[in-house]
């Protein structure tokens, strides 16, 4: 899910509660199923599966859970089947929102998404109504404290050069993290180069990145947006 508001854009949060983590694991589990069914269970021959495994590890999913998910998806009797469905709409004050889902029931999911927009005083729109405001990019987040713990003296310049040499498009520094942006086709190569260098990744995913951001100052609009995002999560 991508938000047109700066604070609504998904960023690293050091502490995730158990319910949030459970939802993330469920989504990643479905992504594992789709990746295995599309390209097989061997990560060495399935770049999409490698990307999903990296995402799982960045979210602290246990290795045995990852392995079980791959084996289950590869089983001949596996009945799990998910489809990707994308919804677009507007939150309060015209904030553009894209919702990406993996579902085994599109009708149910469409109703749930529509309900989330409505309860947050927003509205679901037609396909393409906001997607032109976003660019699909590879997004990698690195926590400064974790980088120092794992890589010692590596500074921002060295990290930036490692990323750019591997094919990254952009590198930016926040207060407590670094963000690396890649073209979708270069994402796997950049991620693998960073992992090979021993750099810990907090987030590694293909995401819809807003071209511009809006700032919400109205308290009610902020509450409505939080309500929408909470329901969508």
Where are these regions (language model features)?
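N-terminal cationic and glycine-rich segments that engage phosphates or anionic surfaces
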Residues: 1-125, 129-143
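Positively charged, low-complexity, intrinsically disordered RNA-binding extensions
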Residues: 141-233
């Amino acid at each position: 899910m991508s938000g047109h508001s700066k604070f609504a854009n998904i960023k690293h949060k050091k502490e995730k509660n158990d319910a949030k983590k459970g939802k993330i694991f469920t989504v990643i589990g479905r992504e594992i199923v789709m990746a295995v069914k599309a390209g097989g269970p061997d990560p060495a021959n399935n770049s999409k599966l490698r990307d999903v495994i990296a995402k799982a590890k960045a979210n602290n999913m246990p290795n045995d859970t990852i392995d079980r998910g791959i084996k289950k998806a590869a089983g001949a009797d596996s009945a799990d089947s998910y489809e990707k469905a994308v919804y677009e709409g507007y939150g309060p004050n015209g904030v553009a929102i894209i919702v990406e889902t993996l579902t085994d029931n599109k009708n149910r999911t469409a109703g749930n998404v529509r309900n989330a927009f409505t309860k947050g005083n927003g509205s679901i729109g037609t396909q393409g109504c906001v997607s032109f405001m976003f660019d699909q990019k590879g997004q990698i987040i690195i926590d400064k404290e974790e980088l120092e713990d794992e890589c010692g003296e590596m500074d921002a310049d060295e990290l930036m050069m490692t990323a750019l040499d591997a094919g990254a498009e952009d590198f930016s520094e926040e207060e407590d993290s670094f963000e690396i942006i890649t073209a979708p086709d270069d994402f796997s190569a950049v991620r693998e180069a960073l992992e090979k260098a021993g750099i810990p990744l907090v987030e590694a995913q293909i995401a819809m990145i807003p071209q511009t951001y809006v700032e919400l100052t109205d308290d009610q609009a902020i509450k409505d947006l939080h309500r929408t995002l909470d329901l969508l999560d």
